[in-house]
């Protein structure tokens, strides 16, 4: 499935350029979700986050423009309810999944994440202090029974599991060439 995003989301602004703007010249906060979502306060905005390609050039991630202390509710999340596992979905319960190709679908995986998703309240929480410019990470096994696609983990944390799976599926690692 191909997901197209508006050009304003694909841009990869550097944190330095965002912080160097004088306050009076900064544009009003814009939601990272399309206008058709008509969301109120508490949802992710361009004032607090940006979506950009990872430093290694692989994949997109959500990065912060400001600090979030441990225990802070970072934001509310939104999306469409679907009944199949696909890229950018997060499992709510059973066969119900939240499809969010604008924000939560771009949270990066870490075996030692800095956020926690409360899928009952649709809230994202900081479980560690998060600095400006840092990628938001979650443990994909914390929400998913079965992943859309398993993959090797490169998070580098001391407790790295090396292979990312859902919490209820066996690892299907490719055979090692001899």
Model-derived regions: residue spans:
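Conserved catalytic SET/PR domain of SAM-dependent protein methyltransferases, capturing the structural core
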Residues: 2-178
């Amino acid at each position: 499935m191909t997901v197209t995003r508006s050009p304003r989301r694909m841009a990869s602004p550097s944190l330095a350029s965002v912080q160097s703007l004088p306050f009076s010249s900064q544009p009003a906060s814009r939601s990272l979700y399309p206008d058709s979502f008509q969301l109120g306060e508490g949802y992710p905005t361009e004032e607090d986050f940006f979506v950009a390609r990872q430093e290694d050039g692989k994949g997109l991630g959500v990065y912060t423009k400001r600090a979030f202390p441990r225990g802070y509710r970072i934001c509310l999340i939104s999306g469409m309810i679907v009944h199949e596992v696909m890229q950018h979905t997060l499992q709510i319960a059973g066969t119900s999944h939240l499809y969010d190709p604008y924000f939560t679908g771009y949270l990066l995986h870490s075996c030692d994440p800095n956020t926690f998703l409360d899928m009952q309240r649709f809230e994202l929480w900081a479980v560690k202090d998060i600095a400006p410019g840092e990628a938001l990470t979650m443990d994909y096994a914390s929400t998913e029974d079965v992943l859309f696609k398993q993959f090797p983990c490169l998070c580098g944390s001391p407790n790295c599991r090396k292979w990312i799976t859902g919490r209820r599926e066996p690892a299907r690692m490719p055979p090692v060439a001899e």
